[in-house]
From Swiss-Prot:
This is Inosine-5'-monophosphate dehydrogenase 2. PANTHER family: INOSINE-5'-MONOPHOSPHATE DEHYDROGENASE 2, INOSINE-5-MONOPHOSPHATE DEHYDROGENASE RELATED. Its EC number is 1.1.1.205. Pathway: Purine metabolism; XMP biosynthesis via de novo pathway; XMP from IMP: step 1/1. The active site is at C331, R429. Catalyzes the conversion of inosine 5'-phosphate (IMP) to xanthosine 5'-phosphate (XMP), the first committed and rate-limiting step in the de novo synthesis of guanine nucleotides, and therefore plays an important role in the regulation of cell growth. Could also have a single-stranded nucleic acid-binding activity and could play a role in RNA and/or DNA metabolism. It may also have a role in the development of malignancy and the growth progression of some tumors. Changing C331A: Loss of activity. Changing D364A: Loss of activity. Belongs to the IMPDH/GMPR family. The modification Phosphoserine is found at S122, S160, S416. It catalyses: IMP + NAD(+) + H2O = XMP + NADH + H(+).
Length: 514
C-alpha cells in the first residue's frame, strides 16, 4: 500500500484534459460528438444556474434557445411558444412577404401590456361583426367607441357574455342594443402604470380594462388573459412595450427590401439574413442598407464558419452572427458542394474571433440533443438555433401523419427541391434562382412527434442547467469565461468512447427523455 503513497498531502493535482485552444488547434474538424467537457466542482443547485444570453448586441434572452427560420419549423405558433418560454422564433421567408409580415403581427399582438391598437367597433356595427372579429383574431372582448376607432369616446364594450346565447337570426342586431354600457365599465386613467392597471384589473374581476383620457376617449386597453400569461411564463421574451419578441428571415435580393419594409411595419424585433454562405457582396450591401434605413433594427448575418467570413460581416455592421454550413440533419451541402465545416470547430473559431468585437454567435445546425446545446454554449456560442430538434412539436407548421404506427410530421431542408419548388426565397438562399438545373443542398424527411414546446423546452432548459452545474458554473457567462481562460477542460472521444457513452449492453430498453 505504501508504494502508492506520495508525500506532501493532496496539494498536487496533475494537469488533466485539454483547453479549448488545444482541442481545436489540432487541425482536425470536430463535431459535438468528438469530445466531452470534463466536470468541475459543485456548490450550488441546478435551478440556480442563470441562462441569460445575448441574442444580438442589444437583445438579451432568458434562455439561449432559438427556432430556425424553416417552413416546417417556425411560423407564428412556434414563435409565440419560443418567446413565452424565454427564447425567440424566426419566421421563415419561404412565403409571400404579406404572409410573413402577418405571422410577425400575430406574435406581436399575442401578449401585450398596454394594447394601443386593439380591434374597435362602433355602436352601429352588428353582432355578426363581432363573430367575424373573433374568428379572425381569436377573441371578442372588443371596446365600442363613437366612431369605431381609437381616440374617440368610449361608449361600451362587447364580450362573449353579451353574445354567447344569441340565436343566428339575432346576428344583425346593432351592438348598442346588447353591449355593456359605459356606466357599467371599470376604466383606468391615461398615464397609469402597468402595475397599477393590472391591480385594478385583478380587483375588478373583468376581462378587459379600458384606458381613457380626460375626455373619456379610448387610448389603450389591458387584457386579463395577459395577466395569466405573465404568471404562467415568467421567462417570456418581451420588448419595451411588453410585447413578445419576434424575429424573421429575409434574403439578400432587391425584392427583399419590400419584404423588410412590411416586417418593420409589423413590428419585427430582429431580422436574420438567410443565406447558406453569408460572406457575399449581396449580404454586405443588404446589411449596410438595413443599418441605414432601420438603424434600431437588429441584424443577424450569416451563415459563416470561418473568422475570415465573420470579419467581412462584422465590418459591415451585423449585430450577431449565425454559424453553421452543411451540418444540419437535412442538409447535404458538404456532400454536394464540398464546402462547409464540422460544427464544433466552426462555433469555436468564429466565437473566439467575434467576441473581440462584442458580436454574439448563434450556433445553427448539428444539434441532436441537449448535450449538444451545452457543448455549443461552452464553445462560445451565446444562443443555439434548432431545426430538427423542434420539428414535429405541436407548434411546428404542418399536419401529423402516421407511418408504421408512429406519429410523424414532415421536416425538410430549405435547400431541398421540395422547398425550392414552393417559393423562390428558398432558391435565393442557395443562389439557385437563375439555375436551369437545381442542385439540391437538402432533403425532405419526417420527424417523430415530440409533443408541445411548453413541455419540451423546459426539459432542454433543465438539461442545460444541470450541465452547467456539473461543469461548476453558475451561469453561461461563467462557462464561456472558464473556457477562454483555460479553466474549462475538454477531452477527445474515440469511436469506442462514443459507444461507451451511449446506451449499450442491453437486450432492450425504453428511452424516455422527459
Amino acid at each position: 500500500m505504501a508504494d502508492y503513497l506520495i508525500s506532501g498531502g493532496t496539494s498536487y493535482v496533475p494537469d488533466d484534459g485539454l483547453t479549448a485552444q488545444q482541442l481545436f488547434n489540432c487541425g482536425d474538424g470536430l463535431t459535438y460528438n468528438d469530445f466531452l467537457i470534463l466536470p468541475g466542482y459543485i456548490d450550488f443547485t441546478a435551478d440556480q444556474v442563470d441562462l441569460t444570453s445575448a441574442l444580438t448586441k442589444k437583445i438579451t434572452l432568458k434562455t439561449p434557445l432559438v427556432s430556425s427560420p424553416m417552413d416546417t419549423v417556425t411560423e407564428a405558433g412556434m414563435a409565440i411558444a419560443m418567446a413565452l418560454t424565454g427564447g425567440i422564433g424566426f419566421i421563415h421567408h419561404n412565403c409571400t412577404p404579406e404572409f410573413q409580415a402577418n405571422e410577425v403581427r400575430k406574435v406581436k399582438k399575442y401578449e401585450q401590456g398596454f394594447i394601443t391598437d386593439p380591434v374597435v367597433l362602433s355602436p352601429k356595427d352588428r353582432v355578426r361583426d363581432v363573430f367575424e372579429a373573433k374568428a379572425r383574431h381569436g377573441f371578442c372582448g372588443i371596446p365600442i367607441t363613437d366612431t369605431g376607432r381609437m381616440g374617440s369616446r368610449l361608449v361600451g364594450i362587447i364580450s362573449s357574455r353579451d353574445i354567447d346565447f344569441l340565436k343566428e337570426e339575432e346576428h344583425d342586431r346593432f351592438l348598442e342594443e346588447i353591449m355593456t354600457k359605459r356606466e357599467d365599465l371599470v376604466v383606468a386613467p391615461a398615464g397609469i402604470t402597468l402595475k397599477e392597471a393590472n391591480e385594478i384589473l385583478q380587483r375588478s374581476k373583468k376581462g378587459k380594462l379600458p384606458i381613457v383620457n380626460e375626455n373619456d376617449e379610448l387610448v389603450a386597453i389591458i387584457a386579463r388573459t395577459d395577466l395569466k400569461k405573465n404568471r404562467d411564463y415568467p421567462l417570456a421574451s418581451k420588448d419595451a412595450k411588453k410585447q413578445l419578441l419576434c424575429g424573421a428571415a429575409i434574403g439578400t435580393h432587391e425584392d427583399d427590401k419590400y419584404r423588410l419594409d412590411l416586417l418593420a411595419l409589423a413590428g419585427v424585433d430582429v431580422v436574420v439574413l438567410d443565406s447558406s454562405q453569408g460572406n457575399s457582396i449581396f449580404q454586405i450591401n443588404m446589411i449596410k442598407y438595413m443599418k441605414e434605413k432601420y438603424p434600431n433594427l437588429q441584424v443577424i448575418g450569416g451563415n459563416v464558419v470561418t473568422a475570415a467570413q465573420a470579419k467581412n460581416l462584422i465590418d459591415a455592421g451585423v449585430d450577431a452572427l449565425r454559424v453553421g454550413m452543411g451540418c444540419g440533419s437535412i442538409c447535404i451541402t458538404q456532400e454536394v458542394l464540398a464546402c462547409g465545416r464540422p460544427q464544433a470547430t466552426a462555433v469555436y473559431k468564429v466565437s473566439e474571433y467575434a467576441r473581440r468585437f462584442g458580436v454574439p454567435v448563434i450556433a445553427d445546425g448539428g444539434i441532436q440533443n441537449v448535450g449538444h446545446i451545452a457543448k455549443a454554449l461552452a464553445l462560445g456560442a451565446s444562443t443555439v438555433m434548432m431545426g430538427s430538434l423542434l420539428a414535429a412539436t405541436t407548434e411546428a407548421p404542418g399536419e401529423y401523419f402516421f407511418s408504421d404506427g408512429i406519429r410523424l410530421k414532415k421536416y425538410r431542408g430549405m435547400g431541398s427541391l421540395d422547398a425550392m419548388d414552393k417559393h423562390l426565397s428558398s432558391q435565393n438562399r442557395y443562389f439557385s434562382e437563375a439555375d436551369k438545373i437545381k442542385v439540391a443542398q437538402g432533403v425532405s424527411g419526417a420527424v417523430q412527434d415530440k409533443g408541445s414546446i411548453h413541455k419540451f423546452v423546459p426539459y432542454l432548459i433543465a438539461g442545460i442547467q444541470h450541465s452547467c452545474q456539473d461543469i461548476g458554473a453558475k451561469s453561461l457567462t461563467q462557462v464561456r469565461a472558464m473556457m477562454y481562460s483555460g479553466e474549462l477542460k475538454f477531452e477527445k472521444r474515440t469511436s469506442s468512447a462514443q459507444v461507451e457513452g451511449g446506451v449499450h449492453s442491453l437486450h432492450s430498453y425504453e428511452k424516455r427523455l422527459f
